[in-house]
Amino acid sequence: MPISAFCSTEEIWQVMMQPNPFIHTTTTGGGALACSAAIAAIRFTLREKLWEQAAAKGEYMIPKLETLAAQYPEIYERITGRGLLIWMHFHNPEVGYKVAAGLFKRGVLVGGTLTNAHTIRIEPPLVIPYELLDKVLDRLSDTLAEVKKTL
């Protein structure tokens, strides 16, 4: 049930239309179920103001991650991010792999960037409750203590 959208400025759109605008069409478009799901998702996003939730939850989460990073300077370079798109930067990919593996073991999914774990991403769903954010932080704290012992 694939669906996608493309938004751009007029300037970018004009470039995309050259030389053949049909290059940027879809082979899976027009599916009624996918379109209905997309409309429902847009309505939910607007009704629940998910962008505001993401901003507030990021303001809650990022300072707590920065505190953890300060407690483990031998592990972290820095924390960056905005809203619920958060990056944890490590001194080297091996440490990032250990942190990611420890989180996976504890049921927390994170993502590497490109082909290594020098930086790993925390990207929870926008509707995640604060209680689960706290669980992520607790599990990260346990993971960091475990990883520190291996350094």
Language model features: what each stretch is:
Residues 1-151:
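Conserved N-terminal phosphate-binding loop of PLP-dependent enzymes in the Aspartate aminotransferase
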